């Protein structure tokens, strides 16, 4: 006999045609926030139906309601099979599931940034080609800076996000499609037509002419009364982020608290919503009412009011949070004892005033150990960081990003030390490979804990040849080449130990107290340009052996107060050209033994005030050419023993005022040629005993007793004026002749 569906309670619409398959039995399960599953037992006259003609394709059932309209159960054929059959009909089994279930068949590793969870969910749906969904959300949701789908199916990913945010879904069925409705509050639900109120009839009074319930069961269970969450925000390390939400119940043991960390928030208002969501998910299980009957038009997500139940407080509005269906249709087999079509449903309900939230049952992905990633940033940059020294990376598993500044969130970097405005700082640079760990194993919470070399980012020292070398070598940025770097390197090779420091440009060393340098052998210091040494207090420099200072051009040495140079043995000072010594006040130069000053050309010595030269023994001063001594005021020269002045040519002494000479004992003056003495005014020559003037055979001798003897060959007295001879005693004139006039 040919199969016909027009008069049957439930009709089947499949990709194989309208009359090819007919329903014999259906068992279905629905729940808010969970995919439905409809298990169908179908019959067909064709035992050779291609299963692939069904698998993965949409199919639907149409259930006739009491008013003649039809309720649809639409889904995707997730599984199908064929049994041995019974009699003249072939037997097929089909499982219908929502298109959302197909997300269990795809997985990814993917990063979402700066998006709210509803937007992430809808993007996942659209990217997989699904558009049959509706946004009925009414709450506000925070923006996630960073959210990772990591080694999990797309279904698990969106499910755990919805569970965390308190979002659930249900399905509205049409003949040719089913629509996923994202919900978070009472306003997302409504009663289906003609089902705003459904009566309860005891089994003994069952009335089949209209939908009703005939079995009622209520259960209550102790739940936690409050939930506290806590978290930490590194940008506000002192902020108290603990939040608490509670729902009071009147029964005993209703106030046991729950506490969890981390709450996955950094703003308290977000934490409060998370805490409220989780306590509401628990309290939605506090009371459940299960109703069994034949209400064909009711399913998950629907509202209705129960009426006629003997316990009046139960005649209230309910939200259907779960449903199970059983449908059996009459058999076609001849002699099969045909049974009529039967429909029965069992609804799991909560008070419509109780907020519904899904329990967080989907496991969070765990990163089981550290990973490596590559530091990224904008094109043309070498270092890309923020005020906290964070960087961005490209994970090797991420096939969606472009390896640029948008590849990840800012990721904190572990440093060797991290204090308040002190510590170490080494910012990973673009292209470097870093080790990434994850706080609590959460892929949403990466932290960089190390860096590693690879075949492109190679080691700074050739290995294994330089295995004894360690240190730190940087690279100048931007545009630095291998020749541009700063470096601190230690060589530990026995017998060749070395500490090497290289500054690519400037090196600044600050020591706030003492600094000690010890060099066991030689020290060489080369400065290609200028050197400035500023010692604000005393400086002591000790050279135990020889010191050689070579100055290629000029040298200026300025001593603000006193300078003392003590030389234990000899000192040789050789000035190739000019030397100028300027002393503002006093200068004392003490030579314990000999001093020799050799001046190849001119020497000018200018003393602005006094100069004292004290020579304990001998002093020899030799001037090869001219010497000029100019003294602006007084000059005192004291020689404790002998002084010899040997002048190879002329000596000229010019005294602007008076000259006074004191000789303690004898004085000898020897003039090789002429001697001229020119006195502008008076001339006094005073001798204690006598004065003798001698030239050849002539002499004048004056004694202290007053006698004067003029001795010579011819003596002439020639006076241009008068000549007076006066004596207190005799005047004696002797001669061969005495001539007058």
Swiss-Prot record:
Stretches with biased composition (Polar residues): 614-629, 649-663
Compartments reported by the entry: Secreted
SUPFAM superfamilies assigned: gp5 N-terminal domain-like, Phage fibre proteins, Phage tail proteins
Chief subcellular location: secreted
Effect of inactivating the gene: Deletion neither impacts secretion of components of the H1-T6SS nor requires H1-T6SS components for its own secretion. However, simultaneous deletion of all three vgrG genes (vgrG1a, vgrG1b and vgrG1c) totally abrogates bacterial killing.
Gene Ontology biological process: protein secretion by the type VI secretion system
Domain of life (superkingdom): Bacteria
GO cellular component, one term: type VI protein secretion system complex
Region described as Disordered: spans on this chain: 614-678
NCBIfam families for this protein: vgr_GE, VI_Rhs_Vgr
Family, similarity comment: Belongs to the VgrG protein family.
Stored PANTHER family: PROTEIN RHSA-RELATED, PTHR32305
Descriptive protein name: Type VI secretion system spike protein VgrG1b
Annotated organism of origin: Pseudomonas aeruginosa (strain ATCC 15692 / DSM 22644 / CIP 104116 / JCM 14847 / LMG 12228 / 1C / PRS 101 / PAO1)
């Amino acid at each position: 006999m040919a199969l016909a569906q027009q008069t049957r309670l439930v009709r089947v619409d499949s990709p194989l045609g309208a009359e090819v398959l007919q329903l014999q039995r259906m068992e279905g399960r629905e729940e808010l926030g969970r995919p439905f599953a409809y298990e169908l037992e179908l019959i067909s006259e064709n035992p050779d139906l291609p299963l692939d003609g069904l698998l993965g394709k949409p199919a639907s059932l149409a259930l006739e309601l009491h008013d003649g309209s039809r309720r649809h159960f639409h889904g995707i054929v997730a599984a199908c099979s064929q049994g041995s059959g019974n009699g003249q009909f072939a037997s097929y089994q089909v499982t219908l599931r929502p298109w959302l279930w197909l997300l269990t068949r795809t997985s990814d590793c993917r990063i979402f940034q700066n998006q709210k969870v509803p937007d992430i969910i809808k993007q996942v749906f659209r990217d997989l080609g699904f558009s049959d969904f509706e946004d009925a959300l009414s709450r506000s949701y925070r923006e996630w800076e960073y959210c990772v789908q990591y080694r999990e199916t797309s279904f698990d990913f969106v499910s755990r996000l919805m569970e965390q945010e308190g979002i659930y879904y249900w399905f509205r069925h049409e003949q040719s499609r089913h629509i996923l409705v994202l919900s978070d509050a009472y306003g997302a639900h409504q009663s289906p037509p003609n089902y705003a109120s459904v009566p309860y009839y005891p089994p003994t009074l069952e009335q089949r002419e209209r939908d009703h319930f005939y079995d009622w069961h209520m259960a209550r269970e102790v739940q936690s009364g409050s939930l506290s969450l806590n978290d930490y925000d590194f940008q506000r390390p002192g902020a108290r982020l603990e939040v608490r939400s509670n729902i009071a119940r009147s029964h005993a043991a209703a106030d046991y608290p729950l506490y969890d960390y981390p709450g996955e928030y950094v703003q308290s208002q977000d934490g409060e919503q998370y805490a409220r969501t989780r306590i509401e998910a628990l309290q939605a299980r506090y009371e459940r009412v299960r109703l069994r009957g034949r209400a064909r038009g009711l399913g998950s997500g629907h509202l209705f009011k129960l009426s006629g139940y003997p316990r009046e407080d139960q005649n209230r509005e309910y939200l259907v949070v779960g449903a199970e269906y059983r449908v059996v249709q009459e058999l076609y087999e001849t002699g099969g004892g045909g049974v009529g079509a039967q429909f029965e449903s069992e609804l799991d309900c909560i008070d419509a005033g109780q907020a519904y939230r899904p329990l967080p049952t989907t496991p969070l992905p765990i990163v089981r150990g550290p990973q490596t990633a590559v530091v990224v940033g904008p094109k043309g940059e070498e270092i890309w960081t923020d005020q906290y020294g964070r960087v961005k990376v490209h994970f090797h598993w991420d096939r969606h990003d472009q390896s640029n500044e948008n590849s990840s969130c800012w990721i904190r970097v572990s440093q060797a030390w991290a204090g308040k405005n002190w510590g170490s700082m080494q910012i990973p640079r673009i292209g470097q490979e870093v080790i990434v760990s994850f706080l609590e194993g959460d892929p949403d919470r990466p932290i960089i804990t190390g860096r590693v070399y690879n075949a492109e980012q190679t080691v700074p020292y050739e290995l294994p040849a330089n295995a004894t070398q360690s240190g730190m070598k940087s690279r100048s940025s931007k545009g630095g080449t291998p020749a541009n770097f700063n470096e601190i390197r230690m060589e530990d090779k026995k017998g060749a130990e070395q500490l090497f420091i290289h500054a690519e440009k400037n090196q600044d060393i600050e020591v706030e107290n003492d600094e000690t340098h010890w060099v066991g052998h030689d020290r060489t210091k080369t400065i290609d340009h200028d050197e400035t040494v500023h010692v604000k207090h005393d400086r002591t420099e000790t050279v135990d052996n020889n010191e050689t200072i070579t100055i290629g051009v000029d040298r200026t040495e300025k001593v603000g107060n006193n300078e003392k140079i003590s030389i234990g043995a000899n000192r040789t000072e050789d000035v190739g050209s000019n030397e100028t010594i300027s002393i503002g006040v006093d200068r004392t130069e003490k030579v314990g033994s000999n001093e020799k000053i050799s001046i190849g050309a001119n020497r000018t010595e200018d003393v602005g005030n006094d100069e004292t030269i004290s020579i304990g023994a001998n002093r020899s001063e030799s001037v090869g050419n001219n010497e000029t001594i100019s003294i602006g005021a007084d000059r005192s020269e004291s020689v404790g023993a002998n002084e010899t002045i040997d002048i190879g040519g002329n000596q000229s002494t010019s005294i602007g005022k008076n000259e006074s000479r004191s000789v303690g004992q004898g004085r000898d003056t020897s003039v090789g040629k002429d001697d001229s003495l020119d006195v502008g005014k008076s001339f006094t020559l005073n001798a204690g005993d006598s004065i003798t003037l001698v030239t050849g055979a002539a002499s004048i001798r004056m004694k202290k007793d007053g006698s004067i003897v003029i001795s010579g060959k011819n003596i002439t007295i020639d006076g241009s004026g008068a000549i007076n001879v006066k004596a207190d005693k005799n005047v004696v004139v002797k001669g061969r002749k005495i001539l007058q006039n």
